């Protein structure tokens, strides 16, 4: 999922099943070594780049490694293959252990001539502008296709008293959730797996410059038959820290909900009700969705995700994208371009008045704690019985 993020955006302290997208840096195609064009004067500052990790991490995500020391400067310099001696001659300090760390994390490769080259995509402003132009064009078409389904979806949620969750469910469950599952099932996007070859993380990690004015992502944590998903932005995450301090209560909430339709643990109610996850009697005030087509919300989500996946398969020219941007294969092409489409599609739906951005995403500074639940939902696996 964004899919976009910053490591540590985990609801569980012992999160072992996250699919994310971390946003904070950038990655790809400027073949200039370091300086770049005048409009890219901020690109050398990693914090001014948007970094996205669509990945399965082991214990951390690669954006954290990029942020250490001068690793970002090294990655920028090694877009052109360079030896350590050449880096030294450019006045770019580095150690062999630093280079080994970057290799271990799959961020650079060593060539046969003992030169190091960046192995991830760093998109400069020109490439980012072209990519986002493709995204806007395809998003315009996609919104035209799914608009009737979105209208019906919002009505369905409103019928169940969940209209305030429409934005985050459309983003985190449908477009940044089940659509990926559909694409993986169809073999259009590579499934992620931690292996001996990829022990730290598996998936895609890239950066873009400049950042979007607004972007959000999804973090998902699973424990047993329950998963909790958070639709986050960087500023919203900071605002929600008081809730995350009570994250130790979430497994106990799961335990109660596995036995009943309400939470009975008084400490859980006291700790989570102020943030809009349960009411004073322990009834969930956030969506609890069974991952089963007998659940009407899940069925509608799954159907719309299929429509989106089919659209991407028929409208995205991955061959042309590989030539233009240097993507390694069709899977990477879809992952990177569709991540841009995620925000463009939701922005268009929001502009059309079909969905409304939750307060904690729209205006984090003034959002009330009881509104935090609007960006959170639970899913329950089919093995619940």
Located regions from the model:
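Minor-groove-contacting beta-hairpin "wing" of winged helix-turn-helix DNA-binding domains
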Residues: 114-119, 282-289
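Bacterial N-terminal signal peptides
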Residues: 24-33
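Short, amphipathic alpha-helical interaction segments positioned at domain boundaries
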Residues: 120-154, 290-322
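Boundary at the C-terminal end of the N-terminal hydrophobic targeting segment
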Residues: 36-38
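Short amphipathic alpha-helical interaction segments
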Residues: 89-105, 110, 260-275
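Short capping segments at the starts of secondary-structure elements
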Residues: 79-87, 247-263
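Short alpha-helical segments that sit at the start of domains
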Residues: 41-72, 208-249
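Extended alpha-helical scaffolding regions
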Residues: 132-231
């Amino acid at each position: 999922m964004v899919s976009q993020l910053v490591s540590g955006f985990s609801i569980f302290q012992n999160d072992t099943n996250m699919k994310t997208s971390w946003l904070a840096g950038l990655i790809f195609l400027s073949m200039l070594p370091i300086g770049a064009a005048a409009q890219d004067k901020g690109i050398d500052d990693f914090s001014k780049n948007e970094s996205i990790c669509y990945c399965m991490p082991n214990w951390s995500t690669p954006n954290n490694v990029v942020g250490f020391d001068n690793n970002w400067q090294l990655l920028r310099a090694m877009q052109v293959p360079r030896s350590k001696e050449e880096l030294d001659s450019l006045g770019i300090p580095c150690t062999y252990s630093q280079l080994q760390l970057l290799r271990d994390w799959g961020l650079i490769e060593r060539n046969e001539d003992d030169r190091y080259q960046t192995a991830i995509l760093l998109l400069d402003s020109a490439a980012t502008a072209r990519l986002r132009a493709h995204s806007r064009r395809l998003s315009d078409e996609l919104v035209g296709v799914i608009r009737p389904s979105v209208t019906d979806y919002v009505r369905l949620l409103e019928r169940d008293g969940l209209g305030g969750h429409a934005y985050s469910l459309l983003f985190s469950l449908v477009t940044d959730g089940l659509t990926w599952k559909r694409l993986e099932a169809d073999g259009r996007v590579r499934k992620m797996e931690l292996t001996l070859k990829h022990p730290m993380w598996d998936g895609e990690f890239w950066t873009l410059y400049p950042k979007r004015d607004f972007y959000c992502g999804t973090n998902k944590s699973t424990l047993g038959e329950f998963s909790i998903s958070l639709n986050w932005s960087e500023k919203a995450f900071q605002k929600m820290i008081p809730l995350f301090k009570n994250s130790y209560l979430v497994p106990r909430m799961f335990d109660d909900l596995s036995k009943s339709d309400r939470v009975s643990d008084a400490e859980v109610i006291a700790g989570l009700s102020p943030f809009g996850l349960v009411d004073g009697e322990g009834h969930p005030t956030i969506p609890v969705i069974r991952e089963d087509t007998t659940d009407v919300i899940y069925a509608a989500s799954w159907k719309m995700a299929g429509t989106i996946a089919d659209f991407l398969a028929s409208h995205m020219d991955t061959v042309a994208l590989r030539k233009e941007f240097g993507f390694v294969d069709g899977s990477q092409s879809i992952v990177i371009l569709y991540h841009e489409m995620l925000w463009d599609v939701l922005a268009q739906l929001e502009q059309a008045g079909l969905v409304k951005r939750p307060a904690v995403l729209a205006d984090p500074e003034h959002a009330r704690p009881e509104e935090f639940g609007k960006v959170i939902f639970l899913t329950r696996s089919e093995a619940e019985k």
